[in-house]
Regions:
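Auxiliary alpha/beta "docking" domains used to position bulky ligands
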Residues: 1-172
Length: 172
């Protein structure tokens, strides 16, 4: 009963913060796919620069996250057409869950803390306690996961098209 109540409160929090959707998941709902690193390595101009990306020294490789994340029993997927909203909602849920006793709660979201990432310029991250790895950078197929949960996502022909941003909060 407590989990159901907490889930409902966290969903309400995400929606109150502007998320379009917040959907509960178990690790079995998440599609782990180590090939996601190829999109980072050969599709991201920030490869080797981002303070939360898998290219940074000492970072786990995407396929090394799966056994860690499978130890969680449940969490929430947060969807928003706005990257910053997805990050802020997921981080707020992580903080609330921690206060509620879920001390290992952990959020993942494309970082939108700064208008322009200072880490990409070789400077220390301005928000090291808030910056998190992107959902896809840890070996998760965001497209297959979102589609499996009935959430909207498609490839875009242009960056001007409406976007779907996803974050995850691993609660317990």
């Amino acid at each position: 009963m407590e989990r159901e109540q907490d889930t409902a409160r966290y969903i309400a929090l995400a929606l109150d913060l502007g998320a379009a959707d917040a959907v509960p998941f178990t690790p079995d709902d998440i599609v782990f796919e180590p090939r996601t690193i190829l999109k980072c390595m050969f599709g991201c101009e920030d490869w080797g620069k981002g303070p939360t990306c898998p290219s940074r020294t000492g970072s786990l490789m995407p396929w090394e996250y799966e056994p860690l994340l499978r130890r969680y029993r449940w969490g929430l997927i947060v969807h928003s057409p706005d990257k910053k909203t997805a990050q802020e909602a997921s981080f707020a849920i992580e903080q609330r869950a921690f206060v509620d006793g879920y001390y290992l709660a952990f959020s993942m979201s494309d970082c939108a803390c700064c208008p322009e990432c200072v880490g990409l310029k070789g400077k220390p991250c301005a928000y090291p306690k808030k910056a998190r790895p992107a959902f896809h950078s840890v070996g998760i197929d965001v497209f297959a996961t979102a589609r499996g949960m009935g959430l909207p996502i498609q490839t875009l022909a242009s960056e001007d098209e409406p976007q779907n941003w996803y974050a995850a909060v691993w609660v317990e």
